[in-house]
Swiss-Prot record:
Taxonomic lineage of the native organism: Archaea, Thermoproteota, Thermoprotei, Desulfurococcales, Desulfurococcaceae
Pathway info: Membrane lipid metabolism; glycerophospholipid metabolism
Needed co-factor(s): Zn(2+)
GO molecular function, one term: glycerol-1-phosphate dehydrogenase (NAD+) activity
Family from the record: Belongs to the glycerol-1-phosphate dehydrogenase family.
Keywords: Cytoplasm, Lipid biosynthesis, Lipid metabolism, Metal-binding, NAD, NADP, Oxidoreductase, Phospholipid biosynthesis, Phospholipid metabolism, Zinc
Enzyme Commission number(s) from the entry: 1.1.1.261
Xref: NCBIfam families: PRK00843.1
EC primary class: oxidoreductase
InterPro entries: G1P_dehydrogenase_arc, G1PDH, Glycerol_DH
Entry protein name: Glycerol-1-phosphate dehydrogenase [NAD(P)+]
Amino acid sequence: MRDRHEIELMKRVVVGRGTRRELPKVIKALGFDGGEVLVVTGPHVWSEWGDELQGLLEKEGFKVDFVTVVEPSVEEANKVLEGLNGEPNVVVGFGGGKAIDVAKYVAMKLGRDVVSVPTATSHDGIASPFSSLKGLKGPTSVKTKTPIAVVADIEVIARAPERLNRAGIGDVLAKFSAVRDWRLAHVLKGEYYGSYAASLALMSAKHVLKYSPLLKALSEDGLRILVEALISSGVAMCIAGSSRPASGSEHLFSHALDVIANRPALHGEQVGVGTIMMLYLHGSKLWRKVRKVLRDLNLPTTAEELGVEDEKIIEALTIAHKIRPERYTILGSDGLTREAAERLARTTGVIK
């Protein structure tokens, strides 16, 4: 058991059609009445929705300073900080995972609260207290700020590229292997394990499995289910105080691919494929079910569908344990041999 466990949770979650119009009201309800709002966004998102959002905020007396980011990196975040025109009262992350991850990091550096306004369901960073940024020393993610609120507009999300929205499905299903890794680390290494946070993360994954038919067409009902599952996953991380309930060996595999692949796929696509293989290593029959659901929902289940060479899959499996050596998973401390990695990828159908 930990000597001390601190939980920081968001104060408000608003999900529905047209909820972007409620953003000024939500910000005011959280105690920010007027002043400057820093909006961190992406160029495509801002070109489509920026004028409307700026108008909504200015109408309610807020001064808006917006900045666009093109990649989730410490360098990009530092550019935002260096280019500030004033001292914002609150930061808004308005976009996909890149913009929101940078916004959370910037908010942490400024000592300000951050409101998450996701425009796609690409991964569970929309509600988590962690940011995955390039240029970090050590782990690929850093504890930043838990969003004080999440405002998810299904109308906006439905207009995101289908591939981006589908990617979040893979990130939610990854909880099946992540929680198993966490439990394994608890049993073998004495690491803290929070059963409540683990149960919440698993519930998100089970929810997506149960309602997968609604997700196939990415209907508004399906998108709402996916958004709520991603938010629940973020809450699980808040409760755990770490990314453990949401990120395990499947994420290490994905991060390894990011390092070595010539053209990595989307994060959620890669962890989905990783989940298939890691569940097999855990001896869980669930790997076949996850593979079937990913196939049914038009998500990659093979190296070819990821657009990654077979050799890169094998290499990623052999180096994944080195990405975060302090995070014990089914890959063990020594990782997989090349022979074991190739056998795993072939057995699960990831490579031919």
